[in-house]
Amino acid sequence: MQLDKQTENNIQITFRNIIEKTCFIDKLRSITGVIKDRFSEHDPRDTDKITYPCEYLFVVILFAGMAGYKTKDDVWHFWDSNSALLNEVFPDLQGNIPSTATITRAQRMLESDVLGGELKSIMSRQYDLVRVSRKIYATEVLSRRDVLACDGQAMRATDRLQPDGSRSGGKQITSIVSYETGMTLGQAIHNKKNQEKKDIIELSKDLDISNTIMTWDAINTHSELVEFVISKHADVFASIKSNQKLTFDEIKEAYESYKKGASPYTKTGHNATATDTVMSGSNHYTRRIVTLRAEDCLSPDVLKKWPHIKTIAVIETASMNMTTGKVTNSVRYYITTLEMDFEKYPDFARDLLAISLKRWCVEVNHWHLDMFFDQDKAAYDDDDAAFCSTIVSKFTMSVFNFAKRAYAAEENRYKGACTTPRLLRACSDISFSALLLESFFNDDARHLTHDRLSRNKKFMKEEERGHWTDMETYDHEPWPLQKFIEQHRKRKKQEAA
């Protein structure tokens, strides 16, 4: 669904006002205005009988989602816990709180094309602004160019038994995540995994991905997708496996010849190498990359299929478990449209090694969504419900990624103090959510880091899995809400048993 020009201008002006205002109540009212402009036309209810306008309901559903609360009961408790603040934002409600049935109807009004289209539009504009402000939009420095990682994720709880006795595999969500900004720039949902390639193209059509480097798994490595990315003035760094058998076999053969010292692979300017080491938990990783010119490795027929591929990259990884001493070796193969130009890219091999790590940002995002937003456990049969729930979670993760990176960059801060579970719990207080959004849309975390994170002990005390103690210095007390919801869920389980 396309925005008309007037609505688009109104949204941009309103979000600018959110940034400039200092009172978070004014910010919330501005956000409510944005939602009213966009969603009121989709409200099917009788206007004469509406007590709770859709914009009021949607803004609370959005902020509740930022705190990880999705069910109608959770949203109601979130509203009740923040009623003092929301009464100031919505004075015409006179302190009334909608029933869970009203909240359910509001959630069903959020169709995927409406909510998804609007959030994608907002994130797309924000992404362009951030790239320009950080001076990475047109940079020629390879290490500073943004990496857009594309991947699909299965919602396993939606896996269903089919009439023929097979399993459906569950709904598949394809998303694009920016490494430099941490933003999710769009998502699509389907019932089959083989839709990923089409989804990547559809999601990227309306995005300005120029001067970025797009990456994806081997299952999506097809010449049509490479052609599309080139047409958008971007580059490709893609994994390749035996699904592209002829290309894969020629690359493997060329790499074996390189290791034996064969020509032309070993000539000056025809290869580049780099090595790095990484410590992660109890594992020690040693990674070595070899880059070769595509014209040296591939036959004319294969080059005709991949006319834009300039370089082949092979990464060998040796992983040692420091506890057991066991070493595991692996080899991965990549193709890229980036040319091995040592004048333009003096540290070409090391830059590609870094890109191969940056592409995992989408996997990290998926892990957080499963662990802290229960995306993998969401058993939605309806596509709209599944889409709306997950797109709010991805929007939240975009904001959280901004906060975590900003806080990690601060000097003399407690390591790991700003984590997803801590931010989720802090967002139980809607004023903190408003502060996060202000910082995110302004791409300026000074108020966030210096005012709230450093002043409150809630980010400094944690028990296992994010449960905090010593909350005496926190001005707004969100913890009774969390405890109440946990008790409510436990009671419902006991009643069901």
Regions found by a protein language model. Give the residues of each.
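Dynamic "connector" segments at or just before major functional cores
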Residues: 1-149, 177-179, 183-187, 401-497
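Short acidic (Asp/Glu) and glycine-rich catalytic loops that position anionic groups and cofactors
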Residues: 39, 231, 327-335, 368-376
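Structural motif
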Residues: 46-56, 165, 324-326, 379-389
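Short, conserved catalytic/metal-binding motifs centered on acidic residues
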Residues: 60, 75, 99, 147-154, ...
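Polybasic low-complexity intrinsically disordered regions
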Residues: 126-233, 241
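An anionic, glycine-rich sequence signature occurring as long contiguous blocks
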Residues: 241-242, 246-352, 356-357
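Short amphipathic alpha-helical "interface-anchor" segments enriched in bulky aromatics
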Residues: 343-380
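C-terminal structured domain segments
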Residues: 384, 388-410
